[in-house]
């Protein structure tokens, strides 16, 4: 039994989809994280264990501590979690480089990220550059993609430097406006595109009067694009069991109330006609109480009538049974009525 369960469990594991592999950080991301933690460590230890008293002594002692190996060791100990194998591996491989920067290169290369990740490890590029040789992004390193997009591979040794434009912009330098946007300002290096009015497919300005072409669901009336009321069309766009609601640029078909046969709007007050079992009362479809009508709804003798939404139910009372034209009292119930407290005889048992 246990072997069967184990085999079944193993088969289930094989059939289950594999867990999604977590995306590993790139070498540049690992290097940047290490540098960020190093800089944070420097900030945390900047005035450690000094807090008032003999100022001259503090300045002298602090100056020694600032560049000491003790401080470096404290910073290095906080760079990687014990469970982060890749971080610890990188630190072990580059420990001597970090010590060299700390002891003799920090003054000439104050930007640790640039010296360590860009120049030494060649894992990253400076902002605005990309790829193995850290080439400038499209539009230049100062304002890649004219400031209106992202440079593929920006700051890394990856990517192709092409521009991925923000919403509203297009073109190799993200300087042109997409359909639905207009140019507010443009020169050789800068471009500002703003959204057209919702009624415009293309436009030259912000209002519905600036439309060059109307969007679908809108039509030009005089000098502006206005909403088309599809619900007012000669042939309604919705089915007979629905009503039409106009919205800007389109329409919505909503279901009629369950009591309606056709409707002009929401709820039982907007029914064109009522379904069977309902009738118009005070302007809306209401349930007919068939059991209270002058003409009896339940035709069989002794039968009880119960009203339900849109209909009624005919049921024989307790102690009665159905026949074709009446509810007939059962023999057992007749005996009980004649002798309500008399116990059953031995023969009856």
Curated annotation (Swiss-Prot):
Gene Ontology, cellular component aspect: endoplasmic reticulum; extracellular space; Golgi apparatus
Disulfide bond residue pairs: 28-31, 137-151, 145-163, 165-174, 260-263, 291-305, 298-314, 316-327
Transmembrane segments annotated in the record for this chain: none
Signal peptide annotation: 1-22
Location within or outside the cell: Endoplasmic reticulum
Annotated tissue distribution: Broadly expressed in brain (at protein level).
SMART domains per record: EGF (SM00181), EGF_CA (SM00179), FU (SM00261)
Pfam families: EGF_CA
Annotated EC: 5.3.4.1
Catalytic activity: Catalyzes the rearrangement of -S-S- bonds in proteins
Quaternary structure and partners: Interacts with Chrna4. Component of a complex containing at least Creld2, Manf, Matn3 and Pdia4.
UniProt name for this protein: Protein disulfide isomerase Creld2
Species of the source: Rattus norvegicus (Rat)
Source organism phylogeny: Eukaryota, Metazoa, Chordata, Craniata, Vertebrata
């Amino acid at each position: 039994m246990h072997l069967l369960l184990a085999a079944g469990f193993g088969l289930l594991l094989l059939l289950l989809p594999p867990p999604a592999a977590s995306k590993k950080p790139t070498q540049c991301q690992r290097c940047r994280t290490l540098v960020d933690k190093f800089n944070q460590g420097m900030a945390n230890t900047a005035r450690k264990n000094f807090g008032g008293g003999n100022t001259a002594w503090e300045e002298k002692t602090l100056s020694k501590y600032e560049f000491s190996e003790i401080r470096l060791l404290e910073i290095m100990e906080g760079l990687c979690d014990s469970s982060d194998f890749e971080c610890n591996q990188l630190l072990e491989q580059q420990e001597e480089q970090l010590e060299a920067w700390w002891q003799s290169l920090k003054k000439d290369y104050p930007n640790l990220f640039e010296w360590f990740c860009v120049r030494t490890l060649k894992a990253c590029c400076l902002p605005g550059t990309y790829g193995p040789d850290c080439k400038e992004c499209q539009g230049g390193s100062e304002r890649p993609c004219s400031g209106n997009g992202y440079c593929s591979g920006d700051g890394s040794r990856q990517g192709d430097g092409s521009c991925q434009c923000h919403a509203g912009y297009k073109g190799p330098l993200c300087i042109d406006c997409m359909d639905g946007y207009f140019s507010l300002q443009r020169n050789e290096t800068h471009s500002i595109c703003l959204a057209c009015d919702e009624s415009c497919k293309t436009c030259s300005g912000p209002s519905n009067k600036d439309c060059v072409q109307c969007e679908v669901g809108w039509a030009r009336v005089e000098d502006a694009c206005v909403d088309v009321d599809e619900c007012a069309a000669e042939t309604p766009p919705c089915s007979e069991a629905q009503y039409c609601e106009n919205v800007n640029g389109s329409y919505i078909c909503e279901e009629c109330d369950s009591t309606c046969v056709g409707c002009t709007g929401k709820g039982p007050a907007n029914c064109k006609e009522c379904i069977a079992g309902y009738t118009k009362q005070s302007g809306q479809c209401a349930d007919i109480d068939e059991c209270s009508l002058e003409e009896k709804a339940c035709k069989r003798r002794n039968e009880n009538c119960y009203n339900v939404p849109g209909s009624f139910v005919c049921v024989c009372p307790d102690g009665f049974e159905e026949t074709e034209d009446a509810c007939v009292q059962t023999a057992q119930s007749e005996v009980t009525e004649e002798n309500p407290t008399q116990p059953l005889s031995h023969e009856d048992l």
